[in-house]
Amino acid sequence: MPFAHLKTGRFHYEVFGDKQLPAVLLIMGLGMPAAGWPRSFISMLLEKSLRVITVDNRDAGLSEHFSHLKTSISVPAAIGRTLLRLPVQAPYLLEDMALDLVQLLDELKLQRAHVVGASMGGMIGQTLASIRPSRVASLTLLCRPQATRERALENCAQFIQS
């Protein structure tokens, strides 16, 4: 299992396909390991002559868990506070997670990659595209958050109740 020892920690990743092919970086959502990407999806990308890179984000899968960074709020409560536009003290930001991926691209000696993000992985991908646009060949968002604040609040309330 390959690991990248980056400035910010140890990250597990996998590479599928020929090194010479254009790269697609798959970013999974909150707390989900890269192993959650369906093998059939990865196979489909390989059949399209693409090189596929999956990575476990911070605090997910086999990557380093940042338990030394303390927070006093649960994830559902933080989501609720964010939706209500209240301040949230987070141990790290989406920008930090995007910069982890920049370091991974550097480690793999890739100037650019097509980026596919699922759920929060899409938010990380959007952040990556906004802070390092030259590193993103294209951006595809899957399972994106709700389009309206009202719908997001309804979903958050349902999540907290269950």
Q: What are the language-model segments listed below?
A:
Residues M1-P2:
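Short, hydrophobic/aromatic-rich segments at coil-to-beta transitions
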Residues M32, M97, M120-M123:
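Methionine-biased hydrophobic packing positions in alpha-helices, especially
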Residues G61-H65, R144-N155:
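A short beta-to-alpha transition loop/helix N-cap that caps and shapes the active-site region
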Residues K19, K48, L99, L108-Q111, ...:
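Structured loop/turn residues at beta-strand edges in well-structured enzyme cores
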Residues Q111-R151:
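Conserved hydrolase catalytic core segment
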Residues L6-L84:
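Conserved HGGG/HGGXW glycine-rich cap/lid loop of the alpha/beta-hydrolase fold
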